[in-house]
Amino acid sequence: MFIDRLDHLVLTVSDIEKTCNFYENILGMKVITFGKDNERKALTFGNQKINLHKKGAEFEPKALLPTAGSADLCFITITPLHEVITELFQKNITIEEGPCERTGALSKPILSVYIRDPDYNLIEISNYK
């Protein structure tokens, strides 16, 4: 077997509306509605998708122990990190750590800042150096 790429991931959240607002207005993602009866929400950016499940009302099948606030996600941006920091400051978003150097998925250095989403998931925003 050869896995080519990640198609989507599921994020369990306590409040779909708050989550959509944060990822759309703070991180610039697009909110989409989908499903047979348009009952589902997802966040899209580039060729990526994050499906949202409300804690306690998850769609089946689901993770064995779906938990809001347990994710640690790294997003790569082409926006220079100093501009990201300025924008986060203007939007009253607390930077928990950074800027600091880490190693990205390409085994190359990235420069990162860390913030929290409404469920306290750890969100890393990075530029490849």
From Swiss-Prot:
Occurrences of domain VOC (ranges): 5-128
Do you know which Pfam families this protein is assigned to?
Glyoxalase (PF00903)
Which InterPro entries does the record match to this protein? Glyas_Bleomycin-R_OHBP_Dase, Glyas_Fos-R_dOase_dom, GlyoxalaseI/FosfomycinResist, VOC
Query: Record's SUPFAM superfamilies?
Result: Glyoxalase/Bleomycin resistance protein/Dihydroxybiphenyl dioxygenase
Q: Which domain of life is it from?
A: Eukaryota
Q: Which PROSITE patterns match?
A: VOC
Task: Tell me which family the UniProt entry assigns to this protein.
Answer: Belongs to the glyoxalase I family.
Name the UniProt record assigns to this protein = Glyoxalase domain-containing protein 5 homolog
Q: Which organism is it from?
A: Dictyostelium discoideum
